[in-house]
């Protein structure tokens, strides 16, 4: 075996998290050596692929699970404000990156699409009105509209209005300033910036082991997945941004911070169409209420997507199940992740999360026609022949130890970092990609605590609101929002997005990384 390749920073996984961290570190430490290892042959081919996620600029504008009703009927907006604040940090960094040549093609990853909450039934419409009243006084949500008029509904959402019985009340919370994000294109542009500035990229290579030496550095053994050839990398800092593959690698590293954590994989499926008549009549990301007792991941939504400059509609998600932690993972991922330190946590979840298990079983039993019937709650005129099933990505929900329960399932993202700051990783899913920038700021602050103060002036140049809650600073919010809107071209509609043609859509097929390039 050849001499170890030495690097200051090793990034494992070529998705949005590693891509974001690589760009941030390159901007504050231009002389550091960096190496990226990715097991697949292309960047952003797992959860960051646009076909593997909803592409919502996840800012809590339309996701109703972030605004629960309290027992007295009032609306708790705490989580919605927190998620939106995080998205604002990402949006400001993207603005800086576009201005400074880090992201050369803004329209390929970001498009203006309204974000809409949708409910039916008198009680739900009343809830939506209370939600609007609670949110609209916050500067971050000030442009939200409340709509319960059927004519206005039909004007804005003609596809959803067709054949709808408006004797059943309808309600919308409409925010014009939403976005559709292609996190695959965004990841590739960020990684391209890193590669242009000296980052070594090793695609088709997999981490097989990692151990920490007495000097605090990490010896990481990797293998070429095509040839089997092995090589060694010596890294001062390791970031594991491997999506569902992060937990097994952090377990291999043996850091105590990962002990007790488990993962529960949940697959996803979408109905999709590229029918030009349908895409022309639905230009919004519309989120509804989850079925009673269903987990947050089950929130149904009918989305406009812009992928490779083509317009699509997606509806879902429908849950699938596989023991794989990655879409292109191994069936042994789940069983091999069970360790003595997390066995109690994982068994505890199996006993306490009966609602999730019931939901998954119900989803797995759905027929094709039953899925389209669910779609008709949103688009009553939907025809089976217009829609096809597409397999989305795997998400691994975090299982954490909990006193008295064994373990609890968490719906969110968790940064794990070793006490010495030499290794960190990201676990979990939603809100995920949209909060990549604040998540990576957290990694930088925790793992480079000695350097972070010297980075802050540069980071504040990238994100003017850093350390400030924009909801408490309406003037600053107006300034950064207006500037970002102009730089990111969000004041210009995604004009003349061509619809897909029949031969560009193949029913029942998964999109390979090469084909979808994300």
Swiss-Prot record:
Annotated pathway: Carbohydrate metabolism; tricarboxylic acid cycle; oxaloacetate from (S)-malate (quinone route): step 1/1
Disulphide bond pairs: none
Region (Disordered): 497-518
Biased composition (Polar residues): 497-509
HAMAP family for the chain: MQO
Similarity comment text for this entry: Belongs to the MQO family.
Name of this chain's protein: Probable malate:quinone oxidoreductase
């Amino acid at each position: 075996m050849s001499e170890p390749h030495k690097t200051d920073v090793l990034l494992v996984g070529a998705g949005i998290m590693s891509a974001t961290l690589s760009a941030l570190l390159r901007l504050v430490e231009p002389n550091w050596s960096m190496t990226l290892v990715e097991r697949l042959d292309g960047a952003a081919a797992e959860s960051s692929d646009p076909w593997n996620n909803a592409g919502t600029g996840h800012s809590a504008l339309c996701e109703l699970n972030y605004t629960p009703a309290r027992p007295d009927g009032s609306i708790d907006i705490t989580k919605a404000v927190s998620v939106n604040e995080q998205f604002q940090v990402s949006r400001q960094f993207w603005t800086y990156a576009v201005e400074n040549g880090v992201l050369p093609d803004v329209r390929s990853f970001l498009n203006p699409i309204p974000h809409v909450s949708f409910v039916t039934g008198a009680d739900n419409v009343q809830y939506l009105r209370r939600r609007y009243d609670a949110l609209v006084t916050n500067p971050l949500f000030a442009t939200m509209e409340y709509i319960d008029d059927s004519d206005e509904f039909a004007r804005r959402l003609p596809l959803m209005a067709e054949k709808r019985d408006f004797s059943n009340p309808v309600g919308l919370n409409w925010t014009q300033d939403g976005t559709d994000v292609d996190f695959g294109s965004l990841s590739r542009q960020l990684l391209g910036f890193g590669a242009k500035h000296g980052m070594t990229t090793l695609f088709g290579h997999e981490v097989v082991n990692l151990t920490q030496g007495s000097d605090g550095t990490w010896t990481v053994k990797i293998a070429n997945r095509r040839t089997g050839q092995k090589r060694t990398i010596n890294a001062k800092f390791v970031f594991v941004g491997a999506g569902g593959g992060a937990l097994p690698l952090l377990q291999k590293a043996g850091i105590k911070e990962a002990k007790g954590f488990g993962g529960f994989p949940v697959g996803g499926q979408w109905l999709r169409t590229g029918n030009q008549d349908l895409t022309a009549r639905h230009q919004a990301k519309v989120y509804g209420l989850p079925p009673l007792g269903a987990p947050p991941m089950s929130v149904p939504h009918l989305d406009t997507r812009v992928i490779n400059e083509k317009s699509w509609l997606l509806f879902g998600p429908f849950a699938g199940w596989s023991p794989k932690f990655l879409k292109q993972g191994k069936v042994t991922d789940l069983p091999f992740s069970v360790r003595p330190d997390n066995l109690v946590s994982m068994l505890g979840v199996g006993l306490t999360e009966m609602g999730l298990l019931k939901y998954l079983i119900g989803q797995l039993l759905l027929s094709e026609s039953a899925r389209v019937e669910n779609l008709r709650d949103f688009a009553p005129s939907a025809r089976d022949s217009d829609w096809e099933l597409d397999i989305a990505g795997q998400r691994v929900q975090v299982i954490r130890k909990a006193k008295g329960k064994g373990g609890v399932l968490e719906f969110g993202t968790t940064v794990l970092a070793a006490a010495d700051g030499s290794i960190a990783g990201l676990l979990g899913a939603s809100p995920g990609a949209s909060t990549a920038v604040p998540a990576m700021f957290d990694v930088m602050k925790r793992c480079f605590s000695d350097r972070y103060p010297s980075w802050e002036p540069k980071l504040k140049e990238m994100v003017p609101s850093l350390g400030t809650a924009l909801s408490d600073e309406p003037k600053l919010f107006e300034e950064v929002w207006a500037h970002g809107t102009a730089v990111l071209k969000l004041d210009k509609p995604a004009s003349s997005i061509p619809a897909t043609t029949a031969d560009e859509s193949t029913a029942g097929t998964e999109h390979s990384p090469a084909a979808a390039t994300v």
